[in-house]
């Protein structure tokens, strides 16, 4: 059986370049640029172009289009069992998210059973179908982390069983990265996957999945710079895929390259809009808004807020859509220090509790920092309720993230009430808890880093030296943030450290000096002019 796979591969695993040309000729559409894949299979020659396209789309997380194409393959060749693997894999959605709703998972289980009934023609195809089946086994009884671990373990077996098949290695690597715990500061799983993918990148420099998954493997601040090569290549490899245009900004955001991030997401959002992919467009818009606000491009960020206000996410919409719709307006208020605006934000209805928490966190900060702690207290209580609900649902990561928010919000409420020692104690607890894990890949960054908030509080408490240390600590994790740079410059100036003040204010002007007017930018200019 193994020999048959290797003999079949040159005949049946077409390169995407050939497949795309055939597909474009058949549809009279301009050729897509999705990269080059060569996926061995035993399906009919008539469906090869579509099958290779479906795999390439999957590698670029274009799930709706990929699933549709795999279904067309199965319709064109009812004996093509591997197409059922593709459909079930697309239903998982973003490998780094929490998986589909139960109703969709049941659809995947049904299509897997169909694949088993069809009967895989090769051992490799049977392994692929059974591997994705491991993800859906006892679906409702397991956590997302447990399901992904099962999928990763299954594909590790597949990769070992077929050591000469690079596609198995590539899929195995992305699933391994997806098991990376956000509180593991060694990044062991992600770096192990990256080592596999770096070898594949040399062999397959135009493969969309390799570049894409390398970015995910390095999407953590301490190792993000290692992903710059893949980030710069991926958009060139698959410019027709919205996610390929967006994904480089994960690395650009981690290293604080805001102009690059903004450009990536402008392109991604445009392609997503043309492709009628609202989820991809919103995810790009959240990253875009984050970048704009660091560059003080406030009018551009405001446009994204207005666009988001006109969108309603269905209850069954991907979690990322719910996240972006909550995050964009909250970022716009908080990043600009528009505290009264933040206090007036309205929580959206959502099944995704941690996205509702974003709005309550922004509201609490806004009210407390507008000297209205009484108004903030109900939002702090709501954050506590959400954290407990997530904990009860065994969603430990997001429960902890919301607890970080609750502590930070409670700190500012205490500060507004005049309980400054208690406030600083709570704010330090928030910052220390936040450092124990990384931000989620659904987000360009937390709404505001806890160490940055600690710096703000220390400044208001007349402790600029301690504030400077807090702002600098914040920049270790989140470099080149506007508010951290300004805060560090201000803290350095007030503590008599002229060199550091000039350093941070100069960086702020270089980064955001051509943006929209902000009083912080003008204050930095005045300091530099006089010092």
What spans do the regions from the language model cover?
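Solenoid-like repeat scaffolds
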Residues: 75, 161, 201-203, 232-240, ...
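Inter-helical turn/loop elements of alpha-helical hairpins
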Residues: 63-68, 87-122, 133-146, 179-188, ...
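Residue at a conserved register position within TPR or TPR-like alpha-solenoid repeats
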Residues: 57, 91, 134, 176, ...
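Amphipathic alpha-helical repeat scaffolds of TPR domains
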Residues: 45-53, 81-94, 120-140, 164-182, ...
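TPR/TPR-like (Sel1-like) alpha-helical repeat modules
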Residues: 81, 88, 92, 103-117, ...
């Amino acid at each position: 059986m193994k020999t048959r796979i290797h003999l079949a591969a040159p005949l049946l695993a077409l390169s995407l370049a050939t497949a795309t040309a055939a597909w474009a000729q058949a549809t009279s559409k301009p050729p897509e640029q999705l990269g080059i894949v060569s996926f061995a299979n035993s399906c009919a020659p008539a469906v090869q172009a579509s099958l290779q396209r479906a795999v390439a789309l999957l590698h670029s997380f274009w799930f709706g289009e990929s699933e549709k194409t795999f279904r067309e393959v199965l319709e064109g060749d009812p004996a093509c069992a591997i197409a059922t693997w593709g459909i079930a894999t697309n239903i998982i959605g973003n490998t780094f998210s929490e998986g589909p709703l139960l109703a969709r998972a049941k659809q995947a289980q049904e299509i897997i059973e169909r694949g088993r009934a069809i009967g895989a023609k090769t051992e490799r195809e049977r392994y692929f179908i059974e591997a994705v089946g491991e993800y859906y086994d006892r679906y409702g009884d397991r956590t997302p982390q447990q399901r992904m671990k099962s999928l990763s373990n299954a594909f590790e077996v597949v990769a070992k069983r077929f050591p000469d098949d690079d596609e198995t290695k590539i899929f195995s690597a992305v699933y391994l990265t997806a098991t990376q715990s956000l509180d593991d500061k060694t990044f062991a799983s992600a770096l192990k996957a990256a080592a596999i993918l770096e070898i594949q990148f040399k062999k397959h420099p135009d493969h969309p999945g390799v570049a894409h998954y390398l970015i995910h493997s390095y999407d953590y601040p301490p190792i993000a710079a290692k992903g710059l090569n893949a980030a710069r290549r991926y958009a060139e490899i698959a410019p027709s895929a919205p996610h390929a245009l967006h994904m480089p900004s994960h690395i650009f955001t981690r290293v604080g390259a805001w102009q690059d991030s903004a450009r990536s997401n402008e392109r991604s959002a445009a392609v997503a809009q043309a492709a009628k992919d609202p989820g991809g467009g919103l995810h790009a818009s959240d990253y875009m808004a984050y970048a704009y606000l660091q560059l003080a491009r406030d009018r551009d960020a405001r446009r994204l807020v207005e666009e988001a206000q006109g969108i309603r996410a269905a209850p069954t919409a991907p979690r990322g859509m719910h996240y972006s719709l909550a995050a964009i307006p909250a970022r716009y208020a908080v990043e600009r220090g528009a505290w009264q605006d933040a206090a007036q934000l309205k929580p959206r209805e959502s099944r995704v509790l941690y996205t509702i928490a974003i709005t309550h966190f922004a509201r609490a900060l806004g009210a407390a920092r507008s000297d209205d702690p009484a108004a903030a207290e109900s939002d702090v209580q709501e954050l506590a309720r959400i954290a407990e609900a997530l904990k009860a649902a065994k969603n430990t990561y997001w429960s902890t993230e919301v607890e970080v928010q609750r502590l930070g919000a409670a700190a500012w409420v205490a500060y507004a009430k005049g309980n400054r020692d208690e406030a600083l104690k709570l704010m330090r607890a928030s910052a220390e808890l936040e450092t124990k894990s990384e931000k989620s890949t659904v987000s360009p960054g937390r709404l505001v880093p806890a160490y940055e908030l600690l710096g703000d509080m220390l400044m208001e408490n007349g402790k600029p030296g301690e504030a400077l240390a807090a702002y600098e600590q914040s920049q270790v994790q989140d470099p080149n943030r506007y508010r951290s740079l300004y805060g560090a410059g201000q803290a350095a100036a007030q503590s008599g450290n002229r060199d550091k003040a000039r350093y941070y204010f100069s960086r702020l002007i270089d980064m955001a000096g051509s943006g929209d007017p902000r009083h912080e930018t003008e204050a930095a200019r005045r300091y530099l002019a006089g010092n």
